[in-house]
Structures are given as C-alpha cells and as structure tokens.
A protein has these predicted regions:
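Conserved NTP-donor binding/palm subdomain of two-metal-ion nucleotidyltransferases/polymerases, i.e.
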Residues: 2-134, 140-295
C-alpha cells in the first residue's frame, strides 16, 4: 500500500476549479452547488486565471455548464471564457486536420506516423476539443522494414519537410527534431525519452517501443490518425509527469491521467519493476481518486 497524506489544503479558487474539473470528467457526479453559492466576481476571476495557467480552461468550462445559471460566473467573465473556449476549439480542429494531412503524406512515402500526447490523448476526453495542448508530437518509423529501417524512415520524414522548404531544427532535443508545418510546431520523435538525461531511459525506451502497438482513432469524426496503446500511455504519461514533477505538475497532466483511468483503468505492465516509478504511478492514481474522483485502486 502506498502511503500518501491527502490532507491537502486548497484555497477557494482551487476548490472551485477542482469541483468544475470533477464534474467535467465525471458526468454522473454533479458539481457541488453549495461551494458556488455567494461567490464574488474576484473569486471567479481567480478561478479562471488558475484554469488558464494550469491548461484546463476549456475543461473547466464544461464543469460550469453543469451549474445552475444563477451560480455561474458573472456575465462579462462568462462571455470571455466562452470566447476563449471557442477559439481553442477552432485551434484544435486545425491541429486535427494538420496531423491527419501530415500522416497521410508520410504514408505515401512508406512512413508510419503515431500521434503522441496532445491531440492523440484528446480522444480519451469527454469532449476531445477541450483537451488543451501546445505542439504536435509524432513518432515516425518504417511502414515496411524490407524497404527501409525505422531510423531511415525517421530521417526521411525530416528530409521531406526540408524538400518542401521547411527548416528542420535537429539541435532542439536529443530525442526529436522540430519544424513548423502550416504554422504548427511539430516534434518528430526518434525515441521517447532522453537517454542522456535519465539513467533508466534506454531500458524504458525499449519497453515503450514494445508497448506502442498503435491503434486507429478518429479526430473530429473524420480525421483518421494512429495513437499509442493505452498500456503505452500508462507508462509514457507517468514518465512524462515524473520529468515535470520537479518544476511542478500541471493540472492538465493530472487530468490526462484521470481520463486514462476512467477509460481503461489502471494496468501497470509487468515489465515495470522499478519501485520508485511504480510508486509514481500509484501516487498519481491516488491523487486522481482523491481530487478528481476517479475510482481506480492505487494499492
């Protein structure tokens, strides 16, 4: 049993935000109306600012929709919030069409493209277009190993962009190159984890290669892409969160984990034997259970 003290003290805007997120992620668990009685405009503004900072602005908006009209934010803030959500929805659709187009282009050159994190994870959310993200992360490899290796396919993906006159940054990171496609930042991964930074990275990267097992997903009801298996995401999301932990874990990381739990439950691959990493997975699950009302065991 992992021991986590859950006596977490939240200020009022934090309480409000978690309540909205719980309602957004769990349609069967209505938001607490008592918490939102007699809320001042200043507190609502603080809640909105916190939601924006934590990358869950659009998701929190879904929680607001479950509140009676008399308990919702003041009209001016509500209008600004709604406009921000609408703008993000438009951006999300642009991302969906861009990644689908890029994947189809690479396919004609014998390259398989898997969408990591971001847009791919949005398929786990109740309203996919309300999962906020920044750049697009892809993993490219060979669709036919009799013709080219995975490394050759990954390099070809970059070279094809250069042939289009697109500048590719090869110094951005050890694990991926970076370029802008139709104004959207794309990170083209050759590995999943920086082997120079983390001692267990080489072993973990091999495990992630094994667990990748991509499946087809639809974005916006018409854009077909490939996303990793849920087992891959269990390991990858937890490791990604661990990387961010020292700088502070954002709520959108926790919401990603909650959506994974809500859809697939917690299934830690038997190959994950490092006790500290397993404890990280269990700790994130316990946090989601306590703060976002997921119900998966974290024992």
């Amino acid at each position: 049993m992992i021991d986590i003290t859950m006596d977490i003290i939240l200020d009022k805007p934090e309480q409000m935000l978690f309540a909205l997120l719980r309602s957004a992620l769990n349609s069967t668990k209505p938001v607490s109306e008592i918490l939102f009685t007699d809320i001042s405009p200043a507190l609502w503004q603080a809640c909105y600012k916190l939601a924006c900072t934590q990358g869950v602005m659009a998701l929190a908006w879904d929680g607001i929709q479950t509140l009676p009209a008399c308990l919702q934010p003041p009209k001016a803030l509500k209008l600004n919030w709604a406009m921000a959500v609408e703008n993000y929805e438009k951006r999300y659709l642009r991302y969906c069409h861009t990644i689908a187009e890029l994947s189809a282009f690479y396919k004609t050159h014998g390259i398989t493209t898997v969408q990591l994190k971001g847009v791919g994870l949005s398929t786990y959310y109740p309203i996919p277009s309300h999962r906020e993200g920044g750049d697009i992360d892809i993993f490219t490899y060979s669709a036919d190993h009799s013709r080219k290796s995975d490394a050759e396919a990954n390099r070809l993906a970059d070279r094809l962009m250069e042939e289009k006159g697109i500048e590719v940054d090869f110094e951005h990171s050890e694990k991926h190159s970076m370029f802008y496609y139709k104004g959207i930042p794309i990170e083209n991964h050759k590995t999943f984890i920086n082997s120079e930074t983390y001692r267990i990275a080489v072993k973990m990267d091999k495990l992630l290669q094994k667990l990748l097992q991509p499946v087809s997903a639809e974005l916006d009801g018409k854009c077909s892409i490939l996303i990793p298996s849920s087992t891959f995401n269990t390991v990858f999301l937890a490791f990604h969160a661990a990387q961010h932990y020292a700088r502070g874990l954002a709520l959108h990381h926790l919401c990603d984990w909650a959506c994974l739990l809500n859809r697939y439950g917690l299934h830690i691959p038997e190959e994950v034997t490092d006790i500290r990493f397993r404890n990280m997975i269990l700790a994130m699950t316990r946090l989601c259970n306590c703060l976002l009302y997921t119900s998966d065991a974290a024992d």
